[in-house]
Swiss-Prot record, chain B:
HAMAP family membership: CbiN
Location of the protein in the cell: Cell membrane
Span of the signal peptide: none
Matching InterPro entries: CbiN
Pfam family, one: CbiN
Function statement: Part of the energy-coupling factor (ECF) transporter complex CbiMNOQ involved in cobalt import.
Taxonomic source organism: Methanococcus maripaludis (strain C7 / ATCC BAA-1331)
Superkingdom field: Archaea
Pathway(s): Cofactor biosynthesis; adenosylcobalamin biosynthesis
Subunit structure: Forms an energy-coupling factor (ECF) transporter complex composed of an ATP-binding protein (A component, CbiO), a transmembrane protein (T component, CbiQ) and 2 possible substrate-capture proteins (S components, CbiM and CbiN) of unknown stoichimetry.
Protein name, as recorded: Cobalt transport protein CbiN
A GO CC annotation given for this chain: plasma membrane
Gene symbol of the encoding locus: cbiN
Keyword Cytoplasm: no
Length: 225, 97
């Protein structure tokens, strides 16, 4: 899911840097606004960031016999939307690129775009579409699953665009096989973990979720406030 | 803990263990349990053999051991923050009920 250092031609690296940069800057503005308007939600920001830190450090075996790790972006996407999640993802990706040589600095833009922007955007959309139609725990689970899948599909598209050999469709299918298939069971795992943590926040601090406009204020009584 | 949560945790455990059981006895030398990132890198070299990565990481963990250390550190930072949040709020919650 990370594109390795140096593996994107300079032109594509620049394009993804530009696109991600715009979203991350917008996300920083949104983040500052959120902290100013609702300082009490700060702990949930730390929580969403920490969740990404943990999940993206767990290299899990998948039924295809290869290993990959979840992104943890679904929780942030559901709570704060894709722009703020992109800022959180940037921190995680910088940590991994600089200290672990996992991902890279030249490919940072592309990796932010897939893991921090497209995945969370898809998760956010799924959450908005299904909210109120299902029990909210399962809505969150599905949002996280689709955020994870969205990330891998995006990475495959990015690689197929940079290496359309012999043609875009074939390359997409090949890269898709490497990533997306490995990721199907891992995404379900990520969804379940996200649902578990969501339920625990709902139990202890429903007021914070109500502040973010995610649940009805009426349901927010009885937490630890 | 609700029944739903027990099922969710079981699901996570089963999904993690299944591949280890399915490919039991096979390892990296047989091409199993390598990273998907590396596999994509290999695929690029395969379809575009003349491609030279044009940038190298500034610094790489000198060994697999050091890499595990840093990955564990990453997880620990995350776990500390989450543990603090839930611990703090759980104590307050128990206090009120």
């Amino acid at each position: 899911m990370h594109i390795m250092e140096g593996f994107l031609p300079p032109m594509w690296a620049a394009i993804w840097f530009l696109l991600s940069g715009i979203v991350v800057i917008y996300g920083i503005i949104q983040l500052n606004k959120l902290i100013k308007d609702k300082p009490e939600v700060k702990p949930t920001l730390a929580l969403a960031g920490a969740f990404m830190f943990i999940l993206s450090s767990l290299k899990l075996p998948s039924v295809t016999g290869s290993c990959s790790h979840p992104t943890g972006g679904g929780l942030g996407a559901v709570m704060f939307g894709p722009a703020i999640t992109a800022v959180l993802a940037t921190i995680v990706l910088l940590f991994q690129a600089i200290l672990l040589a996992h991902g890279g600095l030249t490919t940072l833009g592309a990796n932010i775009f897939s893991m921090g922007i497209m995945g969370p955007a898809i998760g956010f959309l799924v959450f908005k579409l299904l909210k109120g139609k299902l029990n909210i725990t399962w809505v969150v689970v599905l949002a996280a699953i689709f955020a994870d899948w969205g990330t891998y599909v995006t990475t495959s598209i990015q690689l197929a665009l940079a290496y359309p050999l012999p043609d875009f469709g074939t390359a997409l299918a090949n890269f898709g096989t490497v990533f997306a298939v490995t990721q199907i069971p891992l995404a379900i795992m990520e969804g379940l973990l996200t649902g578990l943590i969501w339920d625990y926040i709902m139990k202890l601090r429903p007021d914070l979720l109500a502040k973010l406009g995610l649940i009805e204020p009426a349901k927010a009584e009885g937490g630890a406030e | 803990m609700e029944f739903k949560h027990v099922l969710m945790i079981l699901g996570v455990i089963i999904l993690t263990l299944a591949p280890l059981i399915m490919y039991s006895g096979l390892g990296e030398d047989e091409g199993y349990f390598g990273g998907a990132d590396g596999a994509a890198g290999d695929l690029i070299m395969e379809i575009s053999p003349n491609y030279e990565p044009w940038f190298e990481p500034f610094w790489e963990p000198p060994s697999g051991e050091i890499e595990s250390l840093l990955f564990a550190l990453q997880a620990a930072i995350g776990a500390l923050i989450i543990g603090y949040f839930f611990g703090y709020n759980k104590a307050k919650y128990d206090d009120q009920n």
